[in-house]
Amino acid sequence: MAEEKKEFWRWPEYRRTVPGKDWKGAQVITAGVDVGSVSSKTAIMVDGELYAYAIMRTGSSSAGSAEKVTNWALEGTGLTIKDIHYTVGTGYGRVNVPFAQRAITEIACHARGANFIWGPTVRTVLDMGGQDCKAIQCDSKGKVTNFLMNDKCAAGTGRGMEVFADLLNVPIEEVGPRSFEIDEEPEPVSSTCVVFAKTEAVGLLRAGWPTEKVLA
């Protein structure tokens, strides 16, 4: 029997409920649902504090993915989608979140979220999404002042990283840490196209380059 090929690009889906928090006496329960091109995420907030979250791969239906990931985040809490007072949809499929009261671009959400978590000193947010890569500039209140986006090619995007993870047989969650394991400056991959860059990476491996150097 042929051995099943491991999919190194496939990152683990997960969920978590913050211990020690109780929603039953909460005044406001809110949710943010990010339906991306590759992954769908839900974060549940109770009175302005994180209560539960989940992330899973986006399916063929944006609406179905939004409901599935939100129900998974709520699993075991006693909460249902109907108990959430206000929901915002964001990401590639933001307008298809059926239970959301509002849809906001992921660019605005990134800026506000970074400001909420790390405070007013944040000025730049980098987002490597599944189909594009964004550099976002924001002010001390988390308002977007400028942004740049690469949406023309998979090179430099999350999907591009998945391609290299599978090529190098490295689990996707190890790509970042292992790329920092070399002490020398890596040779740049000359191609800006992920297809040609993959071919170039194959050539480097055949030339005897270690996996970590190719990753870097």
Locations of the language-model features?
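Short beta-strand-loop/turn "lid" adjacent to the catalytic site in phosphate-handling enzymes
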Residues: 52-59, 77-108, 136, 142-145
